[in-house]
């Protein structure tokens, strides 16, 4: 009886919290300082923690970075900003897309906003409440931002509304990671330099300027201006081998079964066994953020230091893996990505980017920080 209870305890302990995203905050700090080493000492840093810090947990990431030399945090909308405030983040929070209906919340939680069109500028001019703002101009991304031709009108409106305190002016690079588009990137930089020079002439003073993201820092650091925005590089991805991924997604085998030649695995009979096989079932699926295109020998995992391929179609909450050629037991650890399974490699197979694979990880996956 005692032996049975001990075995049960060990098994249940292995099976508890089956799927976990392990996050190494020390690597986060090392990535931060590595990227900072490419900058002038006076260059300020905005940490991008939008989309739940690219799936890593925005409050925990922001609190760690808040201990460092950070100008502020960049989020997508007011809900992300409020979440950080309620989570105890004290520093500057910049909302990239504040929307037209969030004014009272922006004021209540002391959030900065990015103003990128006349509708937003007119709204915050009309409200007459003190607000910290950052202007965004379009230089080729053709997404958010005032056009260069609007510059003089924007400055006139700002000068008529001193309650709007402009802290910086920015734009966004469209393709800073690719050398083949270097001319386009340099043209964006040139346009922005002209915009900022004209802006400073019109206001009769200096303003903080920022254009570079992670890949911009890696490839165009001489154009760093006054401030940079670091996103994916903090989490360990980027065209630089010195950046180390900060996360590792692991689960466990929850069931092992043997199947015969001719048996199928998963929905749609998409995988037919050509021989007798042993398969493991892992409780992670596309609802957790595991891309369904990794089905049927596209995706692979590590079990007991052995490479194993996903077979059958990935389900909403599970996938199956071929363990015929390894020694494995129910409860054994499964590495889905991490030091042994590269997110970059996984993204390339899927014709996507690490950003997507990280940010689509469901929040129901437990995050463990060390």
Residues covered by each model-derived region:
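Active-site-proximal beta-alpha core segment in soluble small-molecule metabolic enzymes
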Residues: 19-22, 27-30, 43-211
């Amino acid at each position: 009886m005692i032996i049975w209870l001990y075995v049960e305890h060990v098994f249940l302990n292995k099976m508890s919290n089956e799927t976990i995203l392990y996050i190494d905050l020390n690597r986060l700090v090392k990535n931060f300082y590595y990227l900072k080493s490419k900058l002038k000492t006076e260059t300020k840093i905005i940490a991008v923690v939008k989309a739940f810090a690219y799936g890593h947990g925005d409050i925990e990431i922001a609190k760690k970075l808040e201990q460092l030399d950070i100008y502020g945090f960049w989020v997508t909308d007011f809900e992300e900003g409020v979440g950080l405030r309620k989570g105890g983040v004290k520093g500057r929070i910049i909302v990239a897309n504040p929307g037209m209906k969030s004014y009272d919340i922006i004021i209540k939680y002391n959030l900065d906003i990015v103003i990128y069109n006349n509708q937003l500028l007119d709204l915050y001019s009309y409200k007459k409440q003190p607000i910290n703002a950052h202007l965004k101009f379009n230089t080729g991304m053709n997404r958010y931002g005032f056009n260069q031709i609007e510059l003089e009108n924007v400055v006139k409106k700002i000068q008529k509304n001193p309650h709007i305190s402009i802290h910086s002016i920015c734009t966004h690079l469209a393709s800073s990671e690719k050398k083949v588009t270097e001319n386009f990137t340099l043209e964006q930089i040139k346009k922005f330099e002209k915009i900022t020079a004209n802006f400073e002439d019109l206001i009769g003073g200096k303003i903080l300027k920022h254009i570079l993201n992670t890949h911009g820092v890696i490839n165009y650091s001489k154009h760093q201006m006054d401030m940079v925005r670091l996103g994916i590089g903090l989490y360990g991805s980027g065209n630089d081998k010195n950046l180390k991924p900060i996360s590792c997604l692991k689960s466990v085998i929850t069931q092992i079964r043997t199947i015969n030649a001719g048996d199928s695995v998963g929905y749609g009979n998409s995988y037919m066994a050509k021989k007798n096989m042993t398969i493991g079932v892992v409780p992670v699926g596309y609802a957790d953020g595991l891309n369904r295109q990794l089905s049927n020998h596209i995706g692979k995992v590590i079990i007991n230091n052995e490479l194993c391929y996903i077979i059958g179609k990935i389900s909403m909450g599970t996938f199956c893996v071929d363990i015929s050629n390894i020694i494995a037991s129910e409860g054994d650890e499964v590495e889905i990505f991490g030091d042994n399974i590269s997110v970059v490699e996984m993204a390339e197979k899927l014709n996507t980017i690490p950003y997507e694979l990280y940010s689509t990880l469901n929040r129901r996956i437990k995050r463990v920080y060390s």
